[in-house]
């Protein structure tokens, strides 16, 4: 019985410790920067105009983690209604 109680307390301790450890890693990052990549797309306000691909790269680079800027990235800009653009960077390398 005593062994079971010690085992249970140890399991709970390690469970709490590991969840706090993973949360602490996220807190060390700048909250305005994204490590990014789930979809490689993001919606912004604006209009693509003649140079939408460069505009998308500039907008996305401003919100990405700096490690992504070292890779060669090309983006596509698609204009949507209500002054919205969809920026897509399919060849982006995720960390």
Swiss-Prot record:
**Where does the record place it?**
Secreted
Main location group: secreted
Q: State the Gene Ontology BP annotations.
A: defense response to fungus; killing of cells of another organism; signal transduction
Signal peptide (from-to): 1-24
Q: Which UniProt keywords are listed?
A: Antimicrobial, Disulfide bond, Fungicide, Plant defense, Secreted, Signal
- Per the record, GO CC terms? extracellular region
Using the chain's own numbering, where are the disulfide bonds?
A: 37-94, 48-77, 56-87, 75-89
Homology family: Belongs to the DEFL family.
- What is this protein's record name? Defensin-like protein 247
Native species: Arabidopsis thaliana (Mouse-ear cress)
- What's the encoding gene here? SCRL6
